[in-house]
UniProtKB/Swiss-Prot annotation:
NCBIfam families: PRK13687.1 (NF010240). Transmembrane segments: none annotated. This is UPF0386 protein RL2079. Disulfide bonds: none annotated. Belongs to the UPF0386 family.
Amino acid sequence: MDISRTEQRILHLMAQGGRIEITRDDDRKIEAVSCFTRDGWLYPGVDLDLFRRLKRLRAIKSSGGQPYRITERGLRLVRSQLNNR
């Protein structure tokens, strides 16, 4: 299955240890999404629409109230990229 360039970028970041944290409003609806690198830096470029697409693809999931992490399916979807470190 092909995924977009932005989805690819976020999944690659998450495969390296990144996470997605959500904030909810008083009605328990998601109001904001934040993506953090493994070093703890905030990564811009993740919005609610992209979050929902990744969740619909089952590329990310949360367990036990923890931040969203990449799944096995997400690892299969992401193509290998050279690490620039």
